[in-house]
Amino acid sequence: MVKRSKKSKSKRVTLKQKHKVLKKVKEHHKKKAKDAKKLGLHRKPRVEKDPGIPNDWPFKEQELKALEVRRARALEEIEQKKEARKERAKKRKLGLVDDEDTKTEGETIEDLPKVVNVRDNSERAFYKELVKVIELSDVILEVLDARDPLGTRCTDMERMVMQAGPNKHLVLLLNKIDLVPREAAEKWLMYLREEFPAVAFKCSTQEQRSNLGWKSSKASKPSNMLQTSDCLGADTLIKLLKNYSRSHELKKSITVGIIGLPNVGKSSLINSLKRAHVVNVGATPGLTRSLQEVHLDKNVKLLDCPGVVMLKSSGNDASIALRNCKRIEKLDDPVSPVKEILKLCPKDMLVTLYKIPSFEAVDDFLYKVATVRGKLKKGGLVDIDAAARIVLHDWNEGKIPYYTMPPKRDQGGHAESKIVTELAKDFNIDEVYSGESSFIGSLKTVNEFNPVIIPSNGPLNFDETMIEDESKTQTEEEAEHESDDDESMGGEEEEEAGKTKEKSETGRQNVKLYAAESMLNTKKQKAEKKKRKKAKKAGADEEDLMDGDYDFKVDYRKNKDGEDEEFQIDAKIPMAGLLPEE
């Protein structure tokens, strides 16, 4: 037999065969398309055109306006959702270097005091807004964090309210009541009610813009009350405010000011009472920048106040960071607050929460958290600061559960009992407290909750040095205005003014600049020029008093003496038309 060739056959065909195949393929595709058209497989659905509103419709203009309003509202909701997505993306990227942080790296050392001054000015502005809220309010609600009520109290705020007058009444509001066990909530309410009226509250965590839910304190199933995102305690708080307006027979609306430290839930409280998102809220402290007025109804008006950060801690900045009074991104040293967290929390809980192996020190803990969460710098180095910010964020968000217990009071210190008895008549407290017990009983116990108990922090006070600096800055500004008006002083007065200006940085720079050789001092030149002008004018006035006759030529020369000497050389007096011709 003849062996078959191992070479591959050629794929070359004649042109007749090639065009025959192409024709058959074309006919096949044509037939398939025809069958699909008959069955209607690839037919596009017919878009029905909107006929619009007929012209004969009597309310066409009103309907068109309503459509425009709905369209604008839909666009606004889309923009708000975009902003919410951006905020969530920022939270996910927590710990990375922000744009503002990169800007500060490029700044010089001379620019750093300016940044500090801007921050101080904003804190002073918040303090002024607090004073306004206290002056305008009839009832002041101080919002406290139920996890650490004593640590989120500010005694200076309470003192300001008490000194504002006898018509100002302070009420303590224990917010975030769902984050603590039942035993701690009951003891804290008893402790605080010995000084002022205190109300328990849980803000709504729903995300829709309106119709936020409330849960009544008279619910049939108290065990299911805290499993929802609805608001709790709103009916008791409104009843408290209505009782006050009835007891004083106020015909006008009652103004309620809401004060407290940053991120205790002041804006969330207003949204929960209004049952709509009327005020911006967020987990970052300092979101509210100015006083905001919200009308709850025709009888109650709410005033939202920015959280005051002019605080003086008994310990260090780490304790203020753990109370979420400062932004985590702005902390210079985020590791030191994490050291405090490791002292308070057991290691087993942190190991199970972050799913890391056992650790020994703070650096080891942060190193393992950074490797698990993927926080790395350039070159594969572990970012310790980013891991510390993650832990701080979890602490402030409540992912690391903790609570405190109230301290024991001294037996002799019951000076506030008179205040409580007087306020009990105004607010009808017994009736309000009776309706509150149902949802407090629905809180989880210590065994069910299993949080970390930590020692209670002391109350915070204002930094008095910053308040004193504010009064000093006002006096310095007045002195600067006076020095600007007195530019014409000469000799010794000019040297004294120079000494006062040298205190500022710009004054010192100007002194060095004008002290150099071949440097023109414009201010000194202006002062000398004015001095010469005054001297010439005084001499001319003396000559006028001596001469009785008035001479127009002499008077014209006197007026020209006030001008620059450069323009007086060979200057002729235009007397044509004034004197008779000879």
Swiss-Prot record:
Annotated region (G3), positions in chain: 304-307
Matches recorded under CDD domains: Nucleostemin_like
One Gene Ontology MF term: mRNA binding
PROSITE patterns noted in UniProt: G_CP
Coiled coil (UniProt feature): 15-94, 515-537
Spans annotated as Basic: 2-49
Segments of this protein annotated with the region Acidic: 463-551
Region (G4): 175-178
Region span, G2: 286-290
Binding site for GTP: N175, K176, I177, D178, N263, V264, G265, K266, S267, S268, D304, C305, P306, G307
Keyword terms, alphabetized: Coiled coil, Developmental protein, GTP-binding, Nucleotide-binding, Nucleus, Repeat
Ranges of biased composition (kind: Basic residues): 1-46, 523-537
Function: Involved in the differentiation of epidermal cells, probably via the regulation of the expression of meristem-related genes (e.g. CLV3, STM, KNAT1, CUC2 and AG) and of leaf polarity-related genes (e.g. YAB5, FIL, AS2, PHB and PHV). May play a role in regulating cellular proliferation. Necessary for flower development, probably by preventing apical dominance through the down-regulation of AG expression. Required for embryogenesis, leaf and cotyledon development, as well as for leaf polarity establishment.
UniProt comment concerning the protein's domains: The basic domain (B) allows nucleolar localization in the absence of GTP. The intermediate domain (I) inhibits nucleolar localization by the B domain and is required for exit from the nucleolus. Exit from the nucleolus to the nucleoplasm requires both the I and the acidic (A) domains, and may be triggered by GTP hydrolysis. In contrast to other GTP-binding proteins, this family is characterized by a circular permutation of the GTPase motifs described by a G4-G1-G3 pattern.
Protein name: Guanine nucleotide-binding protein-like NSN1
UniProt source species: Arabidopsis thaliana
Gene this chain is encoded by: NSN1
